[in-house]
Amino acid sequence: MSDIMNIDSIISRLLEVRGARPGKNVQLSESEIRSLCLKSREIFLSQPILLELEAPLKICGDIHGQYYDLLRLFEYGGFPPESNYLFLGDYVDRGKQSLETICLLLAYKIKYAENFFLLRGNHECASINRIYGFYDECKRRYTIKLWKTFTDCFNCLPVAAIVDEKIFCCHGGLSPDLSSMEQIRRIMRPTDVPDQGLLCDLLWSDPDKDTMGWGENDRGVSFTFGAEVVGKFLQKHEFDLICRAHQVVEDGYEFFAKRQLVTLFSAPNYCGEFDNAGAMMSVDDTLMCSFQILKPADKRRFVYPNFGSSGRPLTPPRGANNKNKKK
């Protein structure tokens, strides 16, 4: 693979725009991007679908194509291999630089396979990113064929991680079908995200303070789950914390169920529509968790397309009144 692809050259070109005007594109060749997809796919399949990781590491939530904010996260937390990372999914869609975002993440995965980890989000799925921006970006800047190559790669991403046997991480949340970790390990890849069931729930479900047990999800997919479900899950599996993403939260992180679950969202000033901060959670060797906050940048400098006006509903912050279906 190294004959075809110089990974250091790719990373260095992707990082060249640091300090440039936000929004400046990095145009890798189509064959380089294809190689990133194929090589990372190989690595994903060689590692478990349920990762078992060790602290210290930094955990990040949704990025959604906000490439310059991803660079800010690395500036804050340390560019790999200075720190170990776990990302919780939703790399593409909504923001205008999904390609740079996913290419840098895949490049780091290839270069630092044992220290840099990516989970699958609900947007790493063809039926979703066909609609919410990634397909259009691939088609405009490259080809539809390249978008299909990304789909093949996304279908092999791991879906959950356990940090030091104590912190359970996934993109969305719990599932009424989940009773043993072995069920996650048995999910075969490559796989699309089904409309229901365990894999769907891990990527789509949401905690909800008004739900007792399991409830209907306003997204029109999966379920909501209450604090009691969280407590029972942690007790049964001897975990201390659930760490998930999937929802915009004002401060970049938000606790639920007496600090037994935390939501992380790492795209500040989401799509230029919200005033939310972004956050990254640092887990030290003793499993102490602390949060690094990215304040929303000056809106005039960060211009993201207003998808709200082109029929692509935004994910509302938790507690917002405007409830959108399937996001």
Swiss-Prot record:
It catalyses: O-phospho-L-seryl-[protein] + H2O = L-seryl-[protein] + phosphate; O-phospho-L-threonyl-[protein] + H2O = L-threonyl-[protein] + phosphate. Keywords: Hydrolase, Manganese, Metal-binding, Phosphoprotein, Protein phosphatase. The active site is at 123 (proton donor). GO terms for biological process: defense response to Gram-negative bacterium; negative regulation of BMP signaling pathway; negative regulation of smoothened signaling pathway; positive regulation of canonical Wnt signaling pathway; positive regulation of innate immune response; regulation of glycogen biosynthetic process; regulation of glycogen catabolic process. Residues 308-327 are annotated as: Disordered. It comes from the Eukaryota. The modification Phosphothreonine is found at residue 315. InterPro entries: Calcineurin-like_PHP_ApaH, Metallo-depent_PP-like, PP1_catalytic_subunit, Ser/Thr-sp_prot-phosphatase, STPPase_N. Its cofactor is Mn(2+). One of its GO terms (molecular function) is protein serine/threonine phosphatase activity. Mn(2+) 2 binds at residues 90, 122, 171, 246. GO terms for cellular component: cytoplasm; cytosol; nucleus; protein phosphatase type 1 complex. The keyword Transmembrane helix does not apply. Its EC number is 3.1.3.16. Binds 2 manganese ions per subunit. The keyword Manganese applies. Interacts with Nop17l. Belongs to the PPP phosphatase family. PP-1 subfamily. This is Serine/threonine-protein phosphatase alpha-1 isoform. The lineage of its organism: Eukaryota, Metazoa, Ecdysozoa, Arthropoda, Hexapoda.
